[in-house]
Regions:
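N-terminal pre-domain/capping segments
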Residues: 1-127, 154-157, 207-216
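Conserved strand-to-helix beginnings and helix N-cap segments that scaffold or border functional pockets
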Residues: 21-24, 58-64, 145, 182-186, ...
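Active-site capping/gating regions of soluble enzymes
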Residues: 11-16, 122, 188-198, 208-278
Length: 278
């Protein structure tokens, strides 16, 4: 859906689906049911979550052509893909594994480039297309930052090529979150400063980074870091960083001295997902 100059999409990552067959089934059932409730008769934007398996399968044979036809038939469109979770995201222990493989691994690069091949086909020229991804790595992994920089730069070059071929504005959004390689406004600025410094030391053109790599701003994650949304976004944009996408999500606020509050949040102490608390 479009509101003035911005597009709002329904993100499908809440629906369990790992293969393309499972993903397409979710789109044809659950997602269309949501569309009919909130945007009946209107053009409906889908924020598509694709696992590495689903992305590979979608690129086989004529699957992508069929999906494009289905989107047109259902008056839907895709302008963004959630490329953070590479593998299983439901029904198993996810937690820090959601960061695997991280940006030190070639498999993360290949997967993300496949997502850009897909989004470059699907997204309208008017909106452009984005893919969101993890903030390089998980803090506790102690990742080699130079490998992160090298793989991200390679991805930026691929995005640049696809953007020129399609005439569409394409960009990757790194998503800061608690315990990520960078997790708040200050660390995000510092990461990009090091990224550009690395680029200079390697005598590489910084424009692919400036034009095609930005921030996927999750309102819940930054709230957990006690970063004021307006000030944080202003600081990032004034530093010349692109806001690739904004995830509208909520953080819970409670009194840690209140026994009832502690009891109410106890169910979140479960083995599947990270539930960051600050």
């Amino acid at each position: 859906m479009k509101f003035e100059s911005h597009h709002l999409a329904y993100c499908t990552n809440i629906h369990p689906a790992e293969s393309w067959t499972e993903t397409f089934h979710v789109l044809k059932t659950d997602v269309l049911a949501v569309r009919d409730r909130v945007a009946s008769g209107k053009k409906f934007a889908i924020g598509l979550r694709l696992s590495a398996q689903a992305a590979l399968e979608l690129l086989e044979n004529d699957q992508l052509d069929q999906f494009e036809s289905w989107l047109a038939q259902e008056n839907c469109y895709v302008f963004t893909i959630n490329g953070f979770p590479y593998g299983a995201f439901h029904g198993t222990r996810v937690k820090e594994n959601v960061y695997k493989p991280d940006w030190t691994h070639m498999s993360r690069l290949v997967y993300t480039e496949q997502l850009f091949t897909i989004i470059s086909r699907l997204c309208p020229a008017e909106s452009g297309g984005s893919v969101s991804t993890l903030p390089g790595s998980f803090k506790e992994f102690g990742a080699d930052e130079n490998l992160i920089f090298a793989n991200l730069y390679s991805c930026a070059l691929t995005i640049e090529t696809l953007a020129k071929e399609t005439g569409k504005d394409l960009h990757l959004g790194l998503e800061p979150e608690p315990l990520g390689h960078f997790e708040n406004t200050e660390e995000t600025l510092a990461f990009f400063e090091r990224f550009f410094a690395w680029c200079g030391s390697e005598k590489l053109d910084p424009n692919p980074i400036k034009n095609h790599i930005g921030i996927n701003y999750d309102t819940c994650h930054f709230a957990l870091e006690f970063n004021d949304c307006h000030q944080s976004l202003r600081t990032l944009t004034e530093a010349g960083l692109r806001i690739s996408k904004i995830h509208l999500s909520n953080a819970l606020s409670f009194d840690p001295q209140n026994p009832k509050a502690l009891e109410a949040i106890r169910p979140f102490d479960e083995p599947t997902y990270l539930h960051q608390v600050i």
